[in-house]
Amino acid sequence: MVSAIYSIKAAQHHNPVPNAAILRGLLVTSGILGKRLESDDYPVDKGEQTALVFSYLEVILDEAGATPQDVIKLDLYFADKADRALANEHWLRLWPDPAHRPARQAHQAALPDGCCLQIVAMAVLPQG
């Protein structure tokens, strides 16, 4: 049976969607957006918004008992793929070793107004 994660430390969806779901050691996130928790809006500054997205990823992983090193795939959905450099900064911080980076795919997407990036991650939870 699927176990859902609803984090009070990560932005929530307006639809009845958890932040992530776990089944048989596999964690899959829902779309992670860079909304401010206190105001439920997107920062105008794309760098701030991107930092929030990756910080929420870390929160969700931590609440599941995982780390960035357990991530096996990351999908990035950009309103404008020219913003990839903003994500690369956080990518390199989380996965500095090229030999131990997850698979990654960037997509152009129709995102909510004001949203520059949404990510979806897949991770294998540690045994034990």
Regions found by a protein language model. Give the residues of each.
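N-terminal presequence-like segments and the immediate start of the first folded domain
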Residues: M1-S55, V59-I72, F78-G128
